[in-house]
């Protein structure tokens, strides 16, 4: 089956947008979001905001417009691709990422001193970056989403939505769900794809926590069988 853009790009860009929009909603710092949507999830350490800066914020805006144009209106991608005022302002003022004056992160040079700064999503102001430690006794995905703090809430919100979106593409876009996992491993350098994440979290655990997945035939079928070895 065909799909606008490569399969990995569709899921990968959706994942980036979910990680970003959920951070705007939950009001974590961008350092916190990148610390969670990074190594703890088996995702490169750039996270989402660092990756945005690396790719180019203006280029990402063009990528989103392309997907919006090509994907049907009912596709959930549209919900996470809406223009964000702060992002629009960054582009307009030349803060397009590493190739520009900076982006979500910037290097502030004062004489011989260089200080890495991060933007505040609410105010648009920059301040020195803070090192975030999200380590816990449980370092697997299941342990991460079961944390009783804002990091656990953010991790679950992001991971569950990525899994829901990826599974909505089966079997309409691809008949083999592991094709999506392979695309994410090869194209975005993830340690595990969405369905491998689901397997690690545990099928029963996933459905104990998730609320609505109506219309998603893959998840509806899996919820009936509760097959932990679906992979």
Model-derived features: positions:
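N-terminal glycine-rich phosphate-binding loop for ADP-containing cofactors
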Residues: 1-231
């Amino acid at each position: 089956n065909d799909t606008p853009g490569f399969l990995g790009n569709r899921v990968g860009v959706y994942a980036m947008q979910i990680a970003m929009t959920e951070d705007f909603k939950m009001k974590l710092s961008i350092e916190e979001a990148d610390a969670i949507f990074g190594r703890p999830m088996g995702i490169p350490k750039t996270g989402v905001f660092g990756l945005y800066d690396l790719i180019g914020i203006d280029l990402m805006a063009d990528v989103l417009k392309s997907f919006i144009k090509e994907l049907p209106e009912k596709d959930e991608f549209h919900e996470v691709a809406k223009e964000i005022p702060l992002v629009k302002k960054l582009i307009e003022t030349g803060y397009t990422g590493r190739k520009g004056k900076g982006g979500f992160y910037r290097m502030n040079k004062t004489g011989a001193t260089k200080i890495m700064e991060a933007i505040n999503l609410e105010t648009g102001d920059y301040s020195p970056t803070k090192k975030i430690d999200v380590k816990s006794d449980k370092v697997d995905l299941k342990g991460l989403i079961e944390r009783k703090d804002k990091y656990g809430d953010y991790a679950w919100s992001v991971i569950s939505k990525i899994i829901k979106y990826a599974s909505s593409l089966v079997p309409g876009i691809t008949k083999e769900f592991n094709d999506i996992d392979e695309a994410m491993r090869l194209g975005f350098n993830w340690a595990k794809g969405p369905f491998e994440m689901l397997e690690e979290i545990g099928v029963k655990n996933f459905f104990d926590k998730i609320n609505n997945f109506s219309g998603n035939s893959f998840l509806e079928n899996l919820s009936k069988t509760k097959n932990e070895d679906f992979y």
